[in-house]
From Swiss-Prot:
The keyword Ribonucleoprotein applies. GO terms for cellular component: cytosolic small ribosomal subunit. Part of the 30S ribosomal subunit. NCBIfam families: PRK05610.1 (NF004123), uS17_bact (TIGR03635). GO terms for biological process: translation. Keywords: Ribonucleoprotein, Ribosomal protein, RNA-binding, rRNA-binding. This is Small ribosomal subunit protein uS17.
């Protein structure tokens, strides 16, 4: 049995209004099939923040984990920069 490394992404906290949960916006660039121009696309993820230490505007690293609720299957690894 080999252990797979969890997927980690970096994003910006856009909401921390829930208890022990943050919303993280992750930006990625996608190439337009028609024009060939790169377009920014954002994905919003719900992540588990056990100690409620994140604030809106923080840049954080989150990793994938087991489902903790219907929409929350990421957890906070560390805060890269504080807002």
């Amino acid at each position: 049995m080999t252990e797979q490394s969890s997927r980690t992404v970096q994003g910006r906290v856009v909401s921390n209004k829930m208890d022990k949960t943050i919303t993280v916006a992750v930006e990625r660039k996608v190439k337009s099939p028609i024009y060939g121009k790169f377009i920014k696309r954002t994905t919003k993820l719900h992540a588990h923040d056990e100690t409620n230490q994140c604030n809106t505007g923080d840049v954080v690293t989150v990793r994938e984990c087991r489902p903790m609720s219907k929409s929350k299957n990421w957890m906070l690894v560390d805060i890269v920069t504080k807002a």
